[in-house]
Design a protein with these regions (language model features):
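Glycine-rich phosphate-binding active-site loops on the catalytic face of alpha/beta enzymes
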Residues: 137-138, 174-204
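Conserved, mostly hydrophobic/aromatic
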Residues: 42, 111, 173
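Glycine-enriched alpha-helix->loop->beta-strand junction motifs that scaffold or abut catalytic
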Residues: 19-23, 36-37, 70-71, 107, ...
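Alpha/beta enzyme core
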Residues: 66-69, 96, 100-104, 116-132
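Catalytic cores of alpha/beta
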Residues: 54-62, 120-125, 159, 165-183
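Glycine-rich adenosine-cofactor-binding loop
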Residues: 130, 135, 141-170
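Non-catalytic, usually N-terminal nucleic-acid engagement modules in DNA/RNA processing proteins
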Residues: 1-98, 210-213
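Distinct, well-ordered alpha-helical segments
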Residues: 87-92, 117-127, 144-148
Length: 214
């Protein structure tokens, strides 16, 4: 299972993350630097939400232009705490990214799901080119991640969980059979990386079998 840490400019933390084999999650609302890491590209909606600002379309498009082609995947714009209404925004951007950004044609696009979503809402979109980003509240993520991971596998798609900052939640991700997760704890506090990475490396038999069967 792949761990992504929020991009940081702190050299000590970057060195620790690199040594542990983690990757970076680069936000469209942050510095567009990869620090030489493999990376994924986040749409920046969470940062806008935290600042009580509207979604920054210009920042997202700039990030896609500069970093999209090299990303492991791109998180399609969503509405934080928007419920199923978020899917309308995501579908709009999903179509735009697929048909107007030729340079990212090989990069998987991840649709963010959250409280209020049901598999039937997104299953027509899923494929090896379109995966699932599990957002929403912590409780909802923990209750539903196994279902979303199984759905993604059935469509040959990636399943990623956002904002995972404890060893317990990393173990839940592993048991659910997801492909990757991201969090900010290891970026901000190098001392937390070791327990988080130990949890990442602990293979859960059910999760391992599920991923191998995909």
């Amino acid at each position: 299972m792949i761990g992504y840490a929020s991009r940081t400019g702190t050299r000590r933390n970057l060195d620790a993350l690199r040594a542990a084999g983690w990757r970076l999650m680069v936000s469209a609302r942050g510095a567009l630097r990869t620090e030489g890491f493999p990376y994924a590209l986040d749409n920046g909606a969470w940062t806008s939400f935290q600042r009580n600002e509207p979604f920054d379309t210009v920042a997202f498009e700039r990030a896609v232009d500069q970093l999209g082609a090299g990303a492991d995947f791109i998180v399609v714009p969503d509405i934080v705490n928007g419920g199923i209404a978020s899917l309308t925004r995501s579908r709009h951007w999903w179509e735009k990214l697929r048909f107007t950004y030729d340079h990212i044609g090989h990069v998987p696009l991840l649709i963010a799901v959250q409280d209020g979503f049901d598999p039937r809402h997104v299953v027509p979109l899923l494929s090896p080119r379109t995966g699932v980003f599990i957002g929403g509240t912590t409780g909802w993520k923990e209750r539903t991640m196994r279902r979303w991971a199984a759905l993604a596998r059935s469509r040959g798609a990636i399943c990623h969980v956002g904002r995972v900052n404890t060893a317990r939640r990393i173990r839940l991700c592993e048991a659910a059979g997801v492909d990757s997760f991201d969090g900010s704890s290891a970026s901000r506090f190098a001392v937390t990386l070791r327990p988080l990475d130990l949890a990442r490396q602990q293979t859960d038999l059910e999760g391992y079998i599920a991923r191998k069967a995909a």
